Amino acid sequence: MTVSCSKVLLSLCLFLILLEATHESNQQRTNYREFSEIQLAQETREINEKNNQLLNQQLPRLNRRKRLWRDEDRRTFCTTLCPCEDRRKRAAVTPPTRKVPCCCP
């Protein structure tokens, strides 16, 4: 009876040691995963901030280019579709529409 009790206690102790080691291993894995996720989020945030800075620097130039394209389109539209005899009226008084060209009053 004494031998079997000591074997049971030994088995129980080994099981508890193994359980504790498994728990520590799982905890380390969880900590590493959380650390990796935090690090990835931080790197992503830094990359996004850098990209946003570049876009914010380029935005005025892009808006200017867009405005120039719009003006160029209006000039082309008024020049090619203006039915008015007086070409000086091409200076877009009203925005162009499909029905009425911009150079007409």
Curated annotation (Swiss-Prot):
Source superkingdom: Eukaryota
Keyword line: Disulfide bond, Neurotoxin, Secreted, Signal, Toxin
Post-translational events: Contains 3 disulfide bonds.
Name of this chain's protein: Putative neurotoxin 10
Entry GO MF terms: toxin activity
The keyword Secreted appears for this protein: yes
GO CC aspect terms: extracellular region
Tissue expression from the record: Expressed by the venom gland.
Secretion signal span: 1-21
Location relative to the cell: Secreted
Family: Belongs to the scolopendra neurotoxin 10 family.
Keyword flag Disulfide bond: yes
